[in-house]
């Protein structure tokens, strides 16, 4: 049981597959050594040279602003939703700008990001959040600026560069700002990102599941609150790796990059 990734039309070409893999590799590469700060209920912080409360300043270069998140991580404090989008944008832009040296495509991506004057909003399709209730039908139909959706993905099915979402199903801890769930990038080798370097730059799959479960025990930092950590059994790890409809944490949706240059975006 898994999922299909279909390359059709102009994308039915080995070059489309190769480029898609390379873009995913770039997303993973930019997720590997992060140490941003988590706002933990406070307002996000931004480098004011480039950003005004999350909005790109009119004269700021988006290429420079994105690189700055990784060069000066101490100048920002970001939740996992924003952090995920930053890594994905940087991975895609860096691939076309620096690796492929396709400035025309990089500029087209920037134009797409700026199409509504809010570069960090809407890079993923609205259907990514189809599990949330009530459902806004217009939002569900909204296409992503840089990503499309794969639905009904089987448990344990991940491809490096996937945007994955884990829901915190515990009523009390999920009401704490920032702990409603976890936006994550799958890095390969059973690992997910660690935006805040709380666990040596990555979480193994079982660690990720245990992390989310233990929010109900007040474990909001694995490194600081490890004494409160409850270790889950193999049966519990299996259960919580299922979808929320089945009593688990893992949403069946995956947001993945378009086949840039081989399909409209």
Residue ranges with predicted function:
Residues 1-163, 167-178, 187-265:
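Cysteine-nucleophile amide-bond enzymes
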